[in-house]
Amino acid sequence: SYFVWKEKPKFKFTSIHFWVLLFGFWMLVSTIFNIRVSSDYAWFKYNEFVKVLALFIFITLTVKTKRDIDTFIWAIVLGLSAYAGMEAVKFILSGGGHRIVGRSGILQDRNDLAVAINMAIPLILYLWSVTKHKHLKIGLIGLALLNVVAIVGTYSRGGFIGLVILAFAIWLKSNRKLLFAFIAILAMPILYANAPTEWKERQATVETASTEDGSFIGRLWAWKIATLIALDNPITGGGFKATTDAVLWRMYANETPDFGPIYTKPIPPELTPKAAHNIYFQVLASAGFFGLFVFLCMLSKAYFLSQKNKSRSKKAGIKWSQTLSDAICLSLVAYGITGLNVSLAYFELVYAMLGIIVAIDANKLYEKPVE
């Protein structure tokens, strides 16, 4: 539709464009010089990432007004949060017996789904703030609460930790801190007492994860191998999903026990290679130290530009833009924290958020009243 648009808005190249495209270019370089045994798979994953970059570009080209942004956010919420809400209802009706996972595809893993839900909750709260219809506002609050339940229902420890930190960040920004703190103090013991036993047992393993939890130990192995790959290939890394290459995994497996600050038992020879399960180690293994630097610069620039949009909106009295910029900052914080537990460095929702930040900045929506 953009190509047949008669009056195309003028394109503005921003600092976020620079960092996103530089990251895309560096992933191309790392793919060209990938060290996987099956290089075709690295190219397959790069082609998938190109589609994500295309999504970012088209958002910055076509999303120009508050109406465009709200429509796009509604699409995200109805597609992601509504699914999480339905799964939360099943979790409640089953007395906690229903284990929530995503649909087949990129968010099928429960940890990945928990990250996405954490990122979407601030967007639900934004829609609540700009919605005037009373019943719709009630529905959005209900949806936000169901999304909280959905994170619990994934049994994801990282997702739950991210939820706690997100809730704390939202509380810090609220105008009724004492009231919400009082409600939380009363509600948390009751909710915990009625939580499923299996859920409480899983959350209790956080303290002993490094020595007793096989899932977490597997992550430590993957993080060590990711670092070893980057140390041997500091500029370009090993290419997409380098840690999942069986030959590379076995090549570095013997070096893992005493490598790094945490001792881990030797990797069993029969163990299947593990994904990085951490966005930072994922990029480090895939694109080297320079790639990780660009990735961190991209996320940092997005966060601080959104904060700048928030400040400019507040100064101009544009409440919706201020609230949205604040919500996006919270979503990025949720991603940065829960990303410690998942391999979602190339997640579409992140680049969609970056596109919205660009739309607000490039079109100066922070100073334009709603028509």
Could you tell me what each predicted segment is?
Residues 44-48, 106-117, 279, 284-288, ...:
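Membrane-interface micro-motifs in multi-pass membrane enzymes
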Residues 100-104, 209-224, 232, 236-287, ...:
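Long extracytoplasmic/lumenal interhelical loops at the membrane interface
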Residues 1-29, 39-40, 44, 64-74, ...:
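Transmembrane signal-anchor hairpin modules in multi-pass inner-membrane enzymes, especially those
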Residues 24-32, 50-55, 68-99, 105-173, ...:
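Alpha-helical transmembrane segments of multi-pass inner-membrane proteins
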